[in-house]
Regions:
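Active-site-adjacent beta->alpha loops and helix N-cap segments on the catalytic face
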Residues: 1-11, 36-40, 59-69
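Hydrophobic faces of well-ordered beta-strands that scaffold small-molecule active sites
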Residues: 25-31, 49-53
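Extended, intrinsically disordered, low-complexity segments
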Residues: 70-124
């Protein structure tokens, strides 16, 4: 569980000990996946400049692929034959480019959410 106050206390201790200005240390937030937006914002306010999100991004990709499977399940059981007819082809449904695209769309959505959470949208 993320406890951002530890970051603030660390900044304060370093500032007092070494006579620096405010927020003398830039922090990297390892293991940020699954953190609440309010905790992320608090951590940023205490000097976090980088946050690792790999687990959230992996899950987002999988969730997109899994959602595609659930939606198209009846078209993914055989090469030919689906609810539209026993002789109807399913190639366009099991083509990896199709279901991988669902994963890509899902991960893009999650990345946008992460950028918003991290106050990193439209920053050059």
């Amino acid at each position: 569980v993320l406890n951002p106050i530890i970051l603030k206390n660390s900044q304060d201790m370093i500032q007092q000990k070494f006579g620096t200005g405010p927020k003398p240390v830039n922090f990297v937030f390892h293991g940020g996946s699954g953190s609440e937006k309010a905790k992320i914002e608090e951590a940023i306010s205490y000097g976090v400049i980088k946050m690792n999100l790999d687990t959230d991004l992996q899950w987002a990709f999988w969730d997109g692929v899994h959602s595609y499977y659930k939606e198209k399940k009846d078209y993914l059981q055989a090469q030919i034959g689906n609810p539209e007819g026993d002789d109807k082809p399913n190639k366009k449904y099991y083509d990896p480019r199709t279901w991988l695209r669902s994963g890509e769309e899902s991960i893009v959505k999650r990345l946008k959410q992460s950028f918003e959470d991290l106050n990193a949208m439209n920053r050059g």
